Amino acid sequence: MEENYIFKKIIKRNVLFFILVLVIALIGLIILKYHVEGEQNMPFDLSEILVVSTAEGNQKEETGDNNWNVDIYQTNDVYLNIKKNKNYKDTEIIKNIEIKNINIDEKPSIGKIELYVPSNENEIYNYEENYKINSNIVFEGDKKSDIKNLKISNQGGTIVFRIVNKTGKEYISNDEELKHDGTLLQKAEVNNEDIKAKISFDIVITLESGVSFSGKITIEIPVDDVTTQGVTNLDKKDMKDVVFKRQ
């Protein structure tokens, strides 16, 4: 009898141990799944990333006897579309969306990377200090989007900013017209390999309810060979590699 009691006790202990290990393993799998896949049913989703690459010449004040004396900038306009999730049952409102932790993971061979927000509603960019993005930028939720005043509709909208490479190159010419696109880089003997770069940043969606979701975005610029194609673009709608997690 005593041997049976001890045997049953050992079995019971082993079963409890097995259940404990199983529960821990299950919790571990859930945590791993969340780490890999992130939030699966957010109130608002990042639905699209559009990047438009080209180049422009900024006319210098002193041109001498020449028609053109321009500093050449390689530009990459970034559009992040935030869309309301129709499958989310509860009502939520966007408080703000922040771009932060901006890093240049791979620097270009020539030039200096800087980020700017538009100076007006027509997405015109003035490269002045007050439009420059330094460590972060916050777009406040409002009734409707207002690019100039850094506002986004609290039910979803589009965030716009520019990644610019101030190449340090110039082009001087007496041509009557100057084509402002990526082919301008060739005139300054700049090739696509010279200006390749990789930028990453976090996008944080904060709701009025106090919940925040953060995801990391990585962008390679310019898109394709802008020096020969003039204007190139990337329209990304598959967001599997952008994992959002609650903060």
Residue ranges and their predicted role:
Residues 9-11, 194-197:
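Charged, low-complexity, helix-prone segments enriched in Lys/Glu/Asp/Gln
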Residues 8, 18-19, 45, 202, ...:
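Compositionally biased, low-structure terminal segments
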Residues 22-33:
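Hydrophobic alpha-helical membrane-insertion segments, chiefly the h-region
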Residues 199-205:
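Short, structured surface segments that line ligand/substrate-binding pockets
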Residues 1, 205-207:
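Hydrophobic, Leu/Ile/Phe/Ala-enriched alpha-helical segments that form helix-helix packing faces
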Residues 2-23:
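N-terminal Sec-pathway targeting helices
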Residues 31-195, 210-247:
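Non-catalytic macromolecular-recognition regions in eukaryotic signaling proteins
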